């Protein structure tokens, strides 16, 4: 999971330079995997508030 996070965060830092035509395979696969994990409920996005 940490590797996926690192790839996504690195891509986010380079977001102005990334297009669908030039995105590298590692980034594309990481994004697709995270989307699949979110869709299946294996991952979720949440913000911890007071707790």
From Swiss-Prot:
InterPro entries: THP_succinylTrfase_dom1 (IPR023180), THP_succinylTrfase_N_sf (IPR037133). Keywords: Acyltransferase, Amino-acid biosynthesis, Cytoplasm, Diaminopimelate biosynthesis, Lysine biosynthesis, Repeat, Transferase. It is an enzyme of class 2 (transferase). It comes from the Bacteria. It catalyses: (S)-2,3,4,5-tetrahydrodipicolinate + succinyl-CoA + H2O = (S)-2-succinylamino-6-oxoheptanedioate + CoA. One of its GO terms (biological process) is lysine biosynthetic process via diaminopimelate. One of its GO terms (molecular function) is 2,3,4,5-tetrahydropyridine-2,6-dicarboxylate N-succinyltransferase activity. One of its GO terms (cellular component) is cytoplasm. Its EC number is 2.3.1.117. It is found in: Cytoplasm. Pathway: Amino-acid biosynthesis; L-lysine biosynthesis via DAP pathway; LL-2,6-diaminopimelate from (S)-tetrahydrodipicolinate (succinylase route): step 1/3. Pfam families: THDPS_N_2. Homotrimer. Belongs to the transferase hexapeptide repeat family. This is 2,3,4,5-tetrahydropyridine-2,6-dicarboxylate N-succinyltransferase. The lineage of its organism: Bacteria, Pseudomonadati, Pseudomonadota, Gammaproteobacteria, Enterobacterales.
């Amino acid at each position: 999971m940490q590797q996926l996070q690192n790839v996504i965060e690195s891509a986010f830092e380079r977001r102005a330079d990334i297009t669908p035509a030039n995105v590298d395979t590692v980034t594309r696969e990481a994004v697709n995997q995270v989307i699949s994990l979110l869709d299946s409920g294996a991952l979720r996005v949440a913000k911890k508030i007071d707790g």
